[in-house]
Amino acid sequence: MNIDNNLLIEQKEQQLILTLNRPEASNSLTPELVEVMIDALTQANSIRLCVIKANGKNFCAGFDLSTIESLSDGDLLHRFVRLETLLQIIHHAPCSVLILTQGHSVGAGADIVAAGGYRVAAPGSTFRMPGWQFGIALGTRRLTRLIGTDAARDLLIDTKVAEAEIALSMGLINEISAQSDWASLILRAQQRAMALPETSLNTLMDLTCLLYTSPSPRDRQKSRMPSSA
């Protein structure tokens, strides 16, 4: 296991596990953490399954805003560009990407969830995307393609908190699972990722990303979040 102060990196048996490790800051994303994640994802070879999870009570609180007042507009733009690079790498990964969340996933943290291929939340998890309050559009298209136009607008305009059950009904997550069951869930995901030859899996992931621009079934169903959420 390669241990960074902010990220634990474990690679074994064609499996890459990235664990956000800033629990004292709700795993908020510093520029350094974003770069370490980008490096880990781009340098890994022959991976069938990538797991992204976090230590502590919360999955990810989004951007680390502790130094925002000292940043120039150029510095802030660079941070957004690098975060979008990370999200694109996750979304277009040539392997299966499993996201395991607990507690709160906010802003860029929720964007990481939406970029993953299979998204699992522990009971009691919540998701919130307040970026448009600040004019930040990161992840908007991915979210819309994932859950549909109406549900995305409900989340983004009203900056609603989506609890796990609501997120599941919207399609933001695929499954609710207790953290005690995550080890078996990872094993199941690994077995599924090994079902195809590596080149076939890579091609499949690439083609389905290209087709991701097709209208979501949830768009056609005009699904909406309950107003009480």
Where are these predicted regions, by residue range?
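Glycine- (often His-adjacent) and acidic-residue-rich active-site loop
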Residues: 46, 54-86
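Catalytic-core regions built around general acid/base machinery
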Residues: 40, 82-93
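Conserved CoA-thioester-binding segment of acyl-CoA-metabolizing enzymes
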Residues: 1-55
